Amino acid sequence: AGLARPSAYQYYKSRQDLLHALVLDVFPRWAQRVEEAMRAEPDPADRILAYVLTNIALVAEGEHAVGNALAAVAPSEELNTQSALMHSQLLDPLVSTLQEMGSPDPAATAELINGIVHTATKLLDGERTQEAVEARVKELLEPYVREHRRTPGEQQS
């Protein structure tokens, strides 16, 4: 990002080192944006949509593409493990929200919702617009969110 290849190699010994540094830089900011968007929603059900739409926005902004491009040219088992761990950690606030809502299997439900995020990512990579992808996501998730939204006066448990 702004560095010529020779300059980047002065700082990083290999593509894997560069990618590792990129992941360590991007992931905390990504997770923070998702968590902030979720915290901004007072109702747990609305946090689900915030989780998905924020992830879609981050993908559309391009940070995910840089990591994917580097991973394609410098694949490694360590990177795959690190990436899987970070993606798993991104699910934590979603699982917590689903637990708060009383989901019978929050981990499985979170994986299903995250499947929507992954498919949305592929659609964005396939030249669909962010607006079109978000419209399809809302079409799928808003009925679930409406069904699980608290009624006025219902106490948070």
Model-predicted segments: where are they?
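Hydrophobic/aromatic-rich alpha-helical bundle segments in the mid-to-C-terminal region
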Residues: V66-A71, N80, A84, Q99-L141, ...
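Helix-loop "lid/cap" segments that line or gate small-molecule binding pockets
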Residues: A37, L53-A60, A69-P75, L140-Y144
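Helix-turn-helix
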Residues: A1-D17
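Hydrophobic recognition helices of helix-based DNA-binding modules
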Residues: L22, V26, W30, V34, ...
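Helical hydrophobic small-molecule/effector-binding pocket
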Residues: A45-L70, T81, L85, R150
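Amphipathic alpha-helical packing segments from all-alpha helical-bundle domains
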Residues: P28-A31, A50, L58, S76-E111, ...
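Residues in soluble alpha-helical coiled-coils and helical-bundle/repeat scaffolds
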Residues: K13-D17, A21, R39-D43, A60, ...
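Hydrophobic alpha-helical connector segments
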Residues: A21, D25, E35-E61, I113
